[in-house]
Regions:
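Aromatic-lined glycan-binding groove of carbohydrate-active enzymes
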Residues: 183, 187-191, 226-281
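Hydrophobic faces of well-ordered beta-strands that scaffold small-molecule active sites
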Residues: 7-9, 83-85, 126-128, 154-156, ...
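Catalytic metal-binding/acid-base residues of hydrolase active sites
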Residues: 12, 160, 188-189, 226, ...
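Active-site gating/metal-coordination segments in enzymes
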Residues: 79-221, 228, 355
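Flexible loop/turn segments at secondary-structure boundaries
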Residues: 14-15, 91-93, 163, 192-193, ...
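Glycine-enriched alpha-helix->loop->beta-strand junction motifs that scaffold or abut catalytic
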Residues: 149-152, 177-182, 234-237, 279-283, ...
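Aromatic-anchored helix/helix-loop segment that forms the rim or "lid"
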Residues: 213-221, 265-296
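Mid-to-C-terminal alpha-helical segments outside catalytic/metal-binding sites
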Residues: 2-7, 18-82, 111-115, 119, ...
Length: 357
């Protein structure tokens, strides 16, 4: 099986807390160093651990904690042409009830990666942190760093207080469009901080239950973004759903199209099928890819939406349920493989093809 190039849309580095603290003004610095850094996570027990136990160097250092280690032990090993760095510690701060502290952390984390990580390797690209608990402050941060070299995206948590189609978030989308940046959401903070319960039914009892149900927040945000007219007001906006799976999309759009035909008076700004809007503006990453007992079922799902334009490979490194490039590529037919593994991401993030020696 030949993979001509690999662009990874979801990699999770972890910055040194001391380097973040250096960029925080008081009183935030002292508070950050004391360990109070935002709502965190629900901490359901995962018997595998969240981070892969084998993602360590020969000296026992975590690979995701160093730009040099990440380049050597992941990018070099899998021959990654580009990787989008989505720092995992920026998600929880977006659900803090204290927007000023959250905005300060976002700025500090962004500066660590822009000043220390991106210069370390030309293959690194970065999703800037934007804490949506105060959209105006988030928009200010996007305008501050959105034009910096290596910045390709704005990242927000999929856990949220209200759906992202509501007009309170328009300042974020306006700032992103000004800089030509897609906006992405990522799971993991559903149910923490100022977000609502992680499922429509309330709080689950186990990691298995919580993790399986994370797709619910993606569905809710997508319906909201489309029906509340975000892509009508911001026709240049692109939106990326990271780590939400794939196969739920076609049946959701069938239902949404059907309901729109009967209820279009409730969304008078929509003048075409919701599915057409989604196909034009929305992208999904592959991990965690569905694995049915009969692989042909997955391939049939790929025929039900424009996967060649919407799907981008993601490893989710170094998390426990990550997918390697070779594993992912095997799941896609030859005619689709290059689009998923690199071409769609290259076009979305405007990444020049690197010379290969």
């Amino acid at each position: 099986m030949e993979i001509t190039a690999i662009i990874d849309a979801d990699i999770h580095p972890v910055p040194d807390p001391d380097r973040v603290a250096e960029r925080l003004p008081e009183p935030w610095r002292r508070r950050y160093l004391s360990g109070n850094r935002g709502p965190g996570y629900l901490n359901y027990w995962n018997p595998n651990g969240v981070h892969r136990a084998d993602a360590v160097t020969e000296e026992g250092e975590r690979v995701e904690g160093s730009a040099v280690h990440l380049a050597r032990h992941f990018f070099d090993v899998y021959k990654i042409e580009y990787g989008i760095l989505n720092p995992e510690n920026i998600l929880g701060i977006g659900l803090s009830p204290e927007p000023d502290y959250a905005a300060a952390q976002a700025s500090a984390i962004n500066d660590v990666f822009l000043e220390e990580w991106l210069p370390a390797d030309p293959r690194f690209r970065y999703s800037i942190a934007a804490a949506p608990n105060d959209p105006e402050l988030a928009a200010r941060e996007i305008r501050r760093v959105g034009g910096r070299p290596g910045v390709v995206q704005v990242l927000m948590p999929s856990g949220a207080r209200i759906p992202y189609g509501q007009r309170a978030f328009h300042p974020i989308y306006a700032a992103a469009v000004e800089h030509g940046l897609p906006v992405a959401i990522h799971p993991g903070t559903e149910g923490v901080g100022i977000s609502g319960a992680p499922t429509a039914a309330g709080y689950p009892s186990s990691y298995l239950e919580w993790h399986t149900g994370l797709v619910g927040s993606f569905m809710a945000h997508l319906i909201s973004l489309v029906t509340e007219g975000v892509f009508v007001k911001f026709p240049e906006l692109k939106f990326v759903l990271i780590e939400g799976g794939v196969c739920w999309l076609p049946p959701l759009l069938w239902r949404l199209d059907k309901n729109w035909r009967a209820l279009r008076q409730t969304a008078p700004w929509l003048d075409r099928l919701p599915s057409e809007i989604v196909f034009e503006h929305v992208y999904l990453t592959t991990q965690p890819i569905e694995e049915p007992d009969r692989p042909e079922h997955f391939k049939r799902m790929l025929e039900m939406f424009p996967a060649d334009r919407m799907l981008m490979f993601s490893s989710d490194f170094p998390h426990w349920d990550g997918d390697t490039p070779d594993f992912t590529a095997r799941n896609f037919p030859v005619g689709l493989r290059d689009f998923v593994m690199h071409e769609t991401a290259r076009a979305l993030y405007r990444l020049p093809e690197m010379m290969r020696g």
